[in-house]
Structures are given as C-alpha cells and as structure tokens.
Regions:
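Beta-propeller blade termini and top-face loops
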Residues: 1-257
C-alpha cells in the first residue's frame, strides 16, 4: 500500500528498477530501499520484498538516506548499482547487500536558515558538541577550544539533511555534525556571550529544542514536541536573547511564544 514503504509520500519518493540481466531481481524505493529476487511474487504468507536500508540505520539495517528517487544498474556488472536520494548518491557492488555513501568531499546541501554565534562567545571556553557525521552515519563531535576571540561557530537548518553545527579552525577544512535529523528548519544562536546556547526546530513546530553550550559538553532540552501541522512546514521563528524568549508562527492569524 501507499503507506507501507512511501508513508504517504509516493507523489515525491517512489522509484523502481529491474535488473536488465535478470528481471526477477528488482529494487523499489520510497522512504527506504527494498529488493526482490523473485519478481515480487508472493508465496503463501511470505513477503517477496526484503528491506535493505533504513533512513537512520535501525533494527540491524544499514543506513541509506531517506526519500529514494532514482537508481542505475551497471550494464557491465549487474551487481553494481547506484541509488539517488535526498542525501545524494549511495553505491553497492553486491546488489544492495552493502551500501555506502558516495558524497565525500561534496557539499551540496541547501540551507533554509543559518545562525552565527557572537565572535567572542567561546573566548576562553571549551565545549564539545555531540552529533552525527552523516557521511558515514556515525556518532561524532565538534570540539570548540580557543584562547582568543573570533571563533567562527554556526548552526543551520538544511533541506532534507537535518541541522548542522560547525566551527572553524583557521584556514583548515572542518566537518559539521548533524545535531537534529530529518528536515532542518529554524536555527537561532543566542547573542548573549554569557549565556551560550542555540535553538533548532524540525518542521512546523514539532521539535523545538534548546542546546546549552555553557558547560564542557552540549546538553539538549526539548521546548516543544507535537505531531501537528501548526505553523508553516518551514515555519518562521525568532529568538529574543535578552529575554530568553522564542517567537514562532504557530497558526493562521496568530503567533505563539
């Protein structure tokens, strides 16, 4: 059914590809990826489709980013296949048994919002921001340590690719960590250097969070959690750092705080 593997999004994320050398082998994708080895023919109560990925890697399944759109099977070696999704390109050389990202050193993300910390906020202050390195889908962190001013630290909400936190190291290349999965929406950094925190949100007003950086390790508090569609998909929000108040577009004709 539509709700099974596309979860109501078949207008957006739906692909199918048959192996040109063996049409009994086929791949379908919605949110995640599935493969059949018998042409999708059910035998009794058994499911002819095997799930080969999960959008954040759970239940023993390997990670492949959500929302599948396309795939290409090699005309020379049908074991080799590329999958295109909202996270870029994923590759397998054994019919999807093992998948790996092919986006290393490519920065193709699109920012909805971005928030920058005051340049002196982390002067003489060290803190570790925990998160996930999405290039390998493993836990990672950003360590901020500076004995002088002008540390560039920012956070931003990305289309389909979470909320990324990053800090500079002079002219050296740095990598961001994802601090909130799914779609990244509003991001707001406190402009009070004596109160180090930032605000993030998922879509609508579903997961508004505050991340405290005053200690030596980041700590996250959920300010609002709901399953509704109050506000816009990428809703307008703003932070008054002086009062510690978040304002949000929450419903037609009204604003909540």
């Amino acid at each position: 059914s539509d709700d099974d593997f596309t979860r109501g999004q078949s207008f957006y994320d739906l692909m199918i590809k048959a192996d040109p050398a063996n049409p009994n082998v086929a791949y379908v994708g919605g949110i995640d990826l599935f493969r059949t080895d018998n042409g999708g023919n059910a035998s009794g109560s058994s499911n002819p489709w095997t799930q080969i990925s999960h959008w954040y890697g759970m239940s023993g399944l390997q990670f492949a980013h959500a929302d599948q759109h396309s795939s290409v099977i090699s005309s020379v070696d049908a074991n080799k296949i590329l999958f295109g999704n909202d996270g870029g390109i994923f590759y397998s050389n054994n019919q999807g048994t093992n998948l790996g990202s092919r986006n290393y050193n490519y920065h193709t993300s699109q920012y909805y919002t971005i928030a920058v910390a005051p340049s002196t906020m982390f002067e003489n202050h060290s803190v570790t921001q925990r998160g996930t390195d999405r290039s390998v889908n493993r836990s990672s962190s950003v360590f901020i340590s500076r004995t002088g001013p002008n540390q560039d630290v920012f956070v931003g909400g990305l289309q389909d690719n979470g909320t990324m936190f990053q800090a500079d190291r002079g002219n050296a290349k740095t990598r961001a960590v994802d601090v909130s999965g799914g779609d990244g929406a509003a991001s707001m950094f406190s402009q009070n250097v004596n109160n180090k925190y930032y605000i993030t949100n998922y879509v609508y007003n579903r997961a508004v969070e505050a991340v405290n950086l005053n200690g030596d390790t980041s700590r996250t508090w959920r300010l609002n959690s709901e399953g509704s569609t109050n506000g816009d998909f990428i809703t307008v929000q703003d932070l008054d750092s002086n009062r510690g108040v978040v304002y949000s577009n929450y419903r037609s004709g009204g604003t909540n705080r």
